[in-house]
């Protein structure tokens, strides 16, 4: 009788394991965007776009846009003033955060960059929303409530 119980329990455990393995979700291939719902006090709104192929992030973009549609990374005056103040500007930190996401595949594993920690927090929040949409296969832009 003990052998029957052990055999039954073994089959239940194996079946459950197979169902869990088959049911696991991964990121769906495609492009996924996220952005904050409002502009910050300086007139910028963060945005992230990721591209997923074969279940992995193959490309990422991070930037801020103003109401006119201009990108922070293209604003030479902002780049110069931020670089003077903190040692790094949006041209560098935007690319570095995006590259780190492609390498690590997980927003929570992306390290903060000295001089751009607030932007790093924004990036992680937005990248996490984009990854959630990729996991769910939602192609509409994820709109994230901005921190005040």
Residue ranges and their predicted role:
Residues 12-13:
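Repetitive helical segments and hydrophobic/amphipathic motifs
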Residues 1, 23-25:
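Absolute protein N-terminus
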Residues 1-9:
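Bacterial N-terminal signal peptides that target proteins for export
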Residues 26-148:
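Active-site- and interface-proximal helix/loop "cap" or "latch" segments in soluble metabolic
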Residues 17-21:
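C-terminal motif of bacterial Sec signal peptides marking the signal peptidase cleavage site
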């Amino acid at each position: 009788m003990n052998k029957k119980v052990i055999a039954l329990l073994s089959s239940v455990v194996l079946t459950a394991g197979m169902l869990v393995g088959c049911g696991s979700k991964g990121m769906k291939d495609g492009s996924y965007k996220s952005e904050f719902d409002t502009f910050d006090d300086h007139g910028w709104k963060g945005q992230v776009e990721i591209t997923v192929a074969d279940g992995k992030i193959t490309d990422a973009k991070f930037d801020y846009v103003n109401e006119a549609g201009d990108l922070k990374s293209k604003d030479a005056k902002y780049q110069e003033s931020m670089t003077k103040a903190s040692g790094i500007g949006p041209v560098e930190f935007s690319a570095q955060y995006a590259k780190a996401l492609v390498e690590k595949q997980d927003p929570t594993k992306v390290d903060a960059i000295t001089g751009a920690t607030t932007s790093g927090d924004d990036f992680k929040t937005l990248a996490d929303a984009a990854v959630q949409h990729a996991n769910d296969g939602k192609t509409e832009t994820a709109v994230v409530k901005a921190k005040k």
